């Protein structure tokens, strides 16, 4: 009678224009030709359409619905006609595209079950008269193409006995592209219609694809989703579905900035061996993201992997130079992302490059083998010299600096046993005249992973992560002194929330060489054994981490430690601090001192990051926290465990009372 369209909930019959609008009469009948009185249909003579719902108007058969209509036309041209027509529409859900598109670098693909060519009465339809039409996009900008036209605009169709697969290039007609940084998201609305004389069967579908690298640090993998009209409904990892409201409890945090950023804790990630990585690679298998996109549910499945770590060692050349230097070059585009050449440094020193060309993205170093923090070791027949280059990534936001924001590269060179031997004539100079003027006192304050005090934390490992009430092992030592007759006398140690030792507020941990008696978690002193040359030049103790409070509010979780000390003559102690016996009245000892000593203050090379015991960072990374927890300043973490307010108040009062000056003497 015209064109039949099978939609999701109804059948639409469009009658040809030669049927008069005033003479058209149509009704729905059962297979015996009896009108179905309980069927509610809509006949529009003006538009020459008949809309019939499946419910109560069709008969369910295998694979779909069957409907019969009777058309009566009383026009003079056709005289009186009464014709019955029968239609078949497949079940909608068996013909839908797959809900998740398969995504690759260049295209997305969808599949749905193969559609039989016998639509309606197979005896009346010639298979050669059937064809496919593709509608790409929706709204005013939608384009309807024949299958051949679609193939020329980025579409491909593969039909086998089981299913039809449609592949679409990401730059094809109807594909919408969204970008945020290096992350890309593509969406597509597609309606594939099977058209035959008098019948049209549409199969609408939406698809979404997400691509681009993830970023990883010491604690999390971060996936960026560009901003687009869809709304995230759930995340599924290996068929374990997690709703948005449950994400935080499952180790996934959501950050809504220019789209979405999903931060997956390392407890969610898996590890696998990878030939392209030095160490095991972190990844998520079958990560399914489900969105609500314009009242439709769409999903995409990806398998994100953390990028490999930077190479641990790069040999700069076979041999060190004959004049005792190591030469190497660093290019800004040597890594992805590129390096910020202004942040390059060698080891912990301030050695500068000998050549720098910003236009070429090149920096050249020439570092001495006996300076700039260069180390050496012996392996077989070689003496290997090595140093470490540090740099930040280019265009790194200031709030995102963390341990994983830094590029590290070890450079090496070596001498072999067969290298040329140099003859040197060394003349001994007369010893210098002894100076009786005391030199400046230099102190070092360091922290160690444990009470063995074997290897201190390196400068580049700060901030160091510690949890509340976990001990911090510290050591104060005298530098550049070999006199066995002197000893180090500890004065005060305290903590501040900024780098300035004189900043307020401050919290005392050692006072007058003894533990601070008003502290709930008092400092413990450790004996210095014979493992060092001059044990009297050292002071070792541990501090229990605590939450610093000021004016009843928790301070920043980044804490800076400082200590002051002086040198004593072991045989002629001339200061009360030189003969401290703890516990005792330290205030009285200081008040009775007749001499003033010059005290010297030393600070830790960097801050300590204090985390609450329940922090999600715990258990991630090295078991001794010999490293950083990542993204330190991207999210300020407030210390949670509160010390009694009276501790901060009394500590502040103590600071005001401690106005004094001491002079250094030996």
UniProtKB/Swiss-Prot annotation:
The record's section on Pfam families has: Ig_ZP2 (PF23736), Ig_ZP2_3rd (PF23740), Ig_ZP2_N (PF23738), Zona_pellucida (PF00100), ZP-N (PF23344)
Please indicate the ranges of residues that lie on the Cytoplasmic side.
657-666
Q: Which ranges are cleaved off as propeptide?
A: 589-666
Tissues showing expression: Oocytes (at protein level).
Give the molecular function GO annotations.
acrosin binding; structural constituent of egg coat
Which cysteines pair up through disulfides? They are 6-89, 39-57, 320-413, 351-372, 493-563, 514-582, 568-578
Q: Where is this site: Cleavage?
A: 120-121, 588-589
GO-annotated biological processes: binding of sperm to zona pellucida; prevention of polyspermy
Q: Provide the topology term for how it sits in the membrane.
A: Single-pass type I membrane protein
Q: Does the keyword Membrane apply?
A: yes
Mainly resides where? membrane
Q: Cellular location of this protein?
A: Cell membrane
What InterPro entries does its record include?
Zona_Pellucida_Domain_gp, ZP-C, ZP-C_dom, ZP-N, ZP_chr, ZP_dom, ZP_dom_CS
- Which key words tag this protein in UniProt? Cell membrane, Cleavage on pair of basic residues, Disulfide bond, Extracellular matrix, Fertilization, Glycoprotein, Membrane, Receptor, Secreted, Transmembrane, Transmembrane helix
Post-translational modification here is noted as: Proteolytically cleaved before the transmembrane segment to yield the secreted ectodomain incorporated in the zona pellucida. Proteolytically cleaved in the N-terminal part by the metalloendopeptidase ASTL exocytosed from cortical granules after fertilization, yielding a N-terminal peptide of about 30 kDa which remains covalently attached to the C-terminal peptide via disulfide bond(s). This cleavage may play an important role in the post-fertilization block to polyspermy. Additional proteolytically cleavage of the N-terminal peptide of 30 kDa occurs in one-cell and two-cell embryos.
Q: What glycosylation sites does the entry record?
A: 38, 73, 126, 171, 217, 241, 410, 613
**UniProt region (Disordered), positions on chain:** 417-439
| GO CC terms, sorted | collagen-containing extracellular matrix; egg coat; endoplasmic reticulum; extracellular region; multivesicular body; plasma membrane
Q: Which residues lie on this side of the membrane: Extracellular?
A: 1-636
- In this protein, which residues make up the domain named ZP? 319-585
**Quaternary assembly:** Can form homopolymers that assemble into long fibers (in vitro). Polymers of ZP2 and ZP3 organized into long filaments cross-linked by ZP1 homodimers. Interacts with ZP3.
Record note on domains: The ZP domain is involved in the polymerization of the ZP proteins to form the zona pellucida.
Role of this protein: Component of the zona pellucida, an extracellular matrix surrounding oocytes which mediates sperm binding, induction of the acrosome reaction and prevents post-fertilization polyspermy. The zona pellucida is composed of 3 to 4 glycoproteins, ZP1, ZP2, ZP3, and ZP4. ZP2 may act as a secondary sperm receptor.
The protein's name is: Zona pellucida sperm-binding protein 2
* Originating organism: Oryctolagus cuniculus (Rabbit)
């Amino acid at each position: 009678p015209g064109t039949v369209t099978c939609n999701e909930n109804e059948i639409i019959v469009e009658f040809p224009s030669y049927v008069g609008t005033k003479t058209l009469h149509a009704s729905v009948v059962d297979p015996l030709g009896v009108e179905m009185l309980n069927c509610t249909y809509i006949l529009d003579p003006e538009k020459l359409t008949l809309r019939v719902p499946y419910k109560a108007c069709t008969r369910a058969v295998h694979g779909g619905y069957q409907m019969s209509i009777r058309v009566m036309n009383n026009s003079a041209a056709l005289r009186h006609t009464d014709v019955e027509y029968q239609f078949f529409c497949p079940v909608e859900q068996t013909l839908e595209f797959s809900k998740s598109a398969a995504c690759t670098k260049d295209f997305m693909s969808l599949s749905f079950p193969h559609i039989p060519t016998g639509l309606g009465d197979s005896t009346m339809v010639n298979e050669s008269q059937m064809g496919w039409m593709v509608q790409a996009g929706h709204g005013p900008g939608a384009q309807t193409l024949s299958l051949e036209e679609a193939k020329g605009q980025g579409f491909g169709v593969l039909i086998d006995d089981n299913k039809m697969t449609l592949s679409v290039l990401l730059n094809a007609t109807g594909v919408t592209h969204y970008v945020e940084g290096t992350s890309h998201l593509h969406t597509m609305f597609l309606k594939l219609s099977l058209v035959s004389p008098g019948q049209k069967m549409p199969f609408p579908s939406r698809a979404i694809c997400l691509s681009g690298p993830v970023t990883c640090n010491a604690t999390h993998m971060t996936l960026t989703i560009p901003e687009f009209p869809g709304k995230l409904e759930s995340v599924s990892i290996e068929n374990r579905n997690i709703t948005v409201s449950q994400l935080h409890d499952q180790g996934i945090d959501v950050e809504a900035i220019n789209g979405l950023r999903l931060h997956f804790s390392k407890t969610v990630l898996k590890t696998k061996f990878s030939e392209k990585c030095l160490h095991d690679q972190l990844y998520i298998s079958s990560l399914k993201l489900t969105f609500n996109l314009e009242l439709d549910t769409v999903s995409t499945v990806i398998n994100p992997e953390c990028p490999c770590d930077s190479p641990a060692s790069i040999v700069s050349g076979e041999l060190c130079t004959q004049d005792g230097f190591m030469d190497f070059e660093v290019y800004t585009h040597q890594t992805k992302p590129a390096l910020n050449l202004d942040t390059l440094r060698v080891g912990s020193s301030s050695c500068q490059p000998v050549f720098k060309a910003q236009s070429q993205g090149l920096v050249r170093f020439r570092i001495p083998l006996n300076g700039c923090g260069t180390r050496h070791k012996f392996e077989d027949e070689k003496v290997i010299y090595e140093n470490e280059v540090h740099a930040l990534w280019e265009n790194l936001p200031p709030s995102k600096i963390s341990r994983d924001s830094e590029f590290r590269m070890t450079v090496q060179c070596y001498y072999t046993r067969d290298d040329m031997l140099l003859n040197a004539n060394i003349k001994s100079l007369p010893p210098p005249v002894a100076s009786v003027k005391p030199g400046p006192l230099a102190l070092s304050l360091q922290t160690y992973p444990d009470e063995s005090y074997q290897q201190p934390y390196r400068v580049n490992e700060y901030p160091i992560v510690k949890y509340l009430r976990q001990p911090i092992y510290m050591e104060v030592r005298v530098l550049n002194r070999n006199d066995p007759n002197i000893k180090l006398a500890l004065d005060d140690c305290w903590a501040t929330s900024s780098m300035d030792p004189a900043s307020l507020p401050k919290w005392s941990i050692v006072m007058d060489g003894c533990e601070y008696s008003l502290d709930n978690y008092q400092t413990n002193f450790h004996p210095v054994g014979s493992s060092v040359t001059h044990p009297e030049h050292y002071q070792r103790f541990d501090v229990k981490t605590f939450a610093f409070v000021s004016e009843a509010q928790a301070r920043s979780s980044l804490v800076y430690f400082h200590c002051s000390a002086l040198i004593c003559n072991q045989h002629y102690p001339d200061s009360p601090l030189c003969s401290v016996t703890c516990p005792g009245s330290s205030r009285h000892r200081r008040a009775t001192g007749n001499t003033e000593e010059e005290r010297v203050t030393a600070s830790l090379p960097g801050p300590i990051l204090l985390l609450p015991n329940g922090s999600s960072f715990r258990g991630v990374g090295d078991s001794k926290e010999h490293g950083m927890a990542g993204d330190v300043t991207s999210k300020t973490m407030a210390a949670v465990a509160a010390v009694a307010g009276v501790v901060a108040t009394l500590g502040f009062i103590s600071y005001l009372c401690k106005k004094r000056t001491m002079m250094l003497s030996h």
